[in-house]
Each structure stands twice: as structure tokens, then as C-alpha cells.
Design a protein with these regions (language model features):
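Hydrophobic/aromatic residues positioned on beta-strands within the core alpha/beta folds
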Residues: 90-92
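Short acidic, S/G/P-rich loop/turn micro-motifs used as interaction or catalytic elements
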Residues: 9-13, 59-65, 95-97
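Acidic, metal-coordinating helix/loop segments flanking the phosphotransfer/catalytic sites
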Residues: 17-18, 30-53, 61-63
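Conserved acidic residues
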Residues: 52, 102-105
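Conserved acidic segment of CheY-like receiver
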Residues: 1-12, 16-20
């Protein structure tokens, strides 16, 4: 399974990679801003090798070196408007619900968010 993680926090990205490795997933590409992440998504589709899953935070820069904004929302809207069918998991330290995407994970060190992530990913892999 090929995954793109759009996340500006290196430590959280590494945590997500560890959770995914518990599902046997090692192929995780990373972007830390919306502009580059969107290019990676479009390039994967244009090259006929789309990602199997996109994991996105809610708050990260829209552009390289930019300020943090609600870029996850923009990404989800773009996916819907462009009819992109790659499943999206929102992994945020804000407990959010988005019924139009594959799933949401509430990232918090006080809870077992890894199990929530692994349940969603394993369900996706199982089809």
C-alpha cells in the first residue's frame, strides 16, 4: 500500500509511520505543506500510480515556509471537487468528524490513537 502523509510536524509524521508499520505499511511519502502535497497527489494520478491512501493533518502551511492554516479542509474540498477517489484519513489533534472522507483519527498522547489508525487502515486493506 502506497501512502502520502501530509503533516508539518516531524514527530507526528514519525508516529504515524510507526502506526502504519504495525499494519505492514512501509511505503509512506511525506509532504509538509498543501502545495507540495497536492502536486504529489496530482503527479501520482497523472503517472497512473495513484496513492492508495492519503493521511492529512488539519492545520499545516498552504505553501512551503508559509503559516499554519486549515489546509486539511482545503485538501478535502479539492479531492471532492476534482472527484479524486483516493481514501483520506484525517489525523488531527482536534477531534473532528468528516463524514465525506474515509475516516478521522483523534491524535492525542492521552489515548490509543494508533489503534484507531490501524483499525481504519486494516479495514481499507481488507477491502
Amino acid at each position: 500500500m502506497r501512502v502520502l502523509n501530509i503533516e508539518d510536524d516531524t514527530f507526528k509524521h514519525n508516529d504515524i509511520c510507526k502506526a502504519l508499520s504495525g499494519c505492514g505499511i512501509k511505503d509512506v511519502e511525506w509532504s509538509n505543506n498543501l502545495a507540495d502535497g497536492w502536486k504529489q497527489i496530482k503527479n501520482s494520478i497523472d503517472s497512473n500510480n495513484p496513492y492508495d491512501l492519503i493521511i492529512t493533518d488539519m492545520y499545516y502551511p498552504g505553501e512551503p515556509g508559509g503559516r499554519e492554516e486549515q489546509s486539511g479542509d482545503i485538501l478535502i474540498d479539492r479531492e471532492i471537487k476534482n472527484k479524486i477517489t483516493i481514501p483520506v484519513i484525517l489525523c488531527s489533534s482536534v477531534n473532528l468528524k468528516y463524514p465525506e472522507i474515509y475516516g478521522c483519527v483523534y491524535y492525542s498522547r492521552e489515548r490509543n490513537w494508533e489503534a484507531d489508525m490501524q483499525t481504519l487502515v486494516n479495514s481499507l486493506v481488507a477491502g
